[in-house]
């Protein structure tokens, strides 16, 4: 699989996870925290992976992290700025022209699909390359040019909170299902994990996928067929 040395990877650690009741990034997924699983998925294909979240929280996992200084604490007077602030922080910190930005709660992402998305983005004239599903756009599994940072920071300063509203000012190249599903047809690919039921479903899927992979590895190969010896010996 190709490594895109001109692309930086960022994982948005997420907010308070009020519906989950726990930090989604630290939930066990296949024996490791979900955010570490996601980092390992990105590491082989990008120049480096950075978490946008609390540096002290993720340092113990060996992950580089930057604080999202633009995020305000939740409250009636200062509502949280959500993932838009995380995207702004990533694009402010980056030195790479292209940046793969994903949320930490997308357990079904595949390396094959991310590799394809990056290849697709590097040939695009858009400022952001964003997949779309039947539910709408998926800006938290997308590729952004560094120059998008200024427009997104400006949107934050004006009080914009929805990512979908902020990117209206960008030149967006939408990737429709008919295109990306040729690479990864799974309906689960871009499904995020918000509630305990979603987490249980993702864990079951992960366990089944690992079991299937192990069975494939352990499956014995058929013994090679022996050549039949001729019943008639050559006469001297």
Please name every model-derived segment.
Residues 2-189, 200-211:
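Nucleotide and nucleotide-moiety/phosphate-recognizing core
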């Amino acid at each position: 699989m190709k490594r895109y040395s001109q692309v930086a990877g960022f994982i948005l650690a997420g907010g308070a996870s009020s519906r989950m009741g726990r930090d989604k990034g630290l939930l066990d997924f296949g024996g490791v925290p979900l955010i570490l699983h996601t980092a390992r998925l990105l590491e082989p294909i990008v120049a480096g992976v950075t978490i946008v979240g609390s540096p002290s929280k993720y340092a113990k996992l060996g992950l580089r992290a930057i604080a999202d200084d633009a995020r305000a604490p939740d409250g009636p007077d200062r509502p949280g700025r959500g993932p838009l602030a995380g995207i702004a922080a990533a694009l402010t910190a980056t030195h790479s022209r292209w940046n793969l930005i994903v949320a930490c709660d997308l357990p079904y992402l595949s390396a094959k699909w991310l590799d394809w998305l990056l290849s697709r983005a590097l040939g695009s004239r858009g400022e952001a390359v964003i997949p779309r599903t039947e539910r709408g756009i998926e800006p938290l599994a997308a590729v952004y040019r560094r120059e998008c940072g200024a427009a997104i920071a400006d949107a934050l300063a004006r009080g914009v909170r929805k990512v979908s509203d902020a990117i209206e000012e960008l030149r967006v190249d939408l990737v429709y299902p008919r295109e990306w599903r040729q690479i990864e047809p799974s309906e689960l690919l871009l499904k995020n994990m918000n509630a305990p039921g979603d987490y249980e479903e993702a864990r079951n899927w992960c366990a089944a996928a690992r079991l299937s992979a192990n069975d494939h590895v352990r499956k014995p190969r058929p013994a090679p067929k022996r050549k039949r010896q001729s019943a008639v010996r050559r006469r001297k």
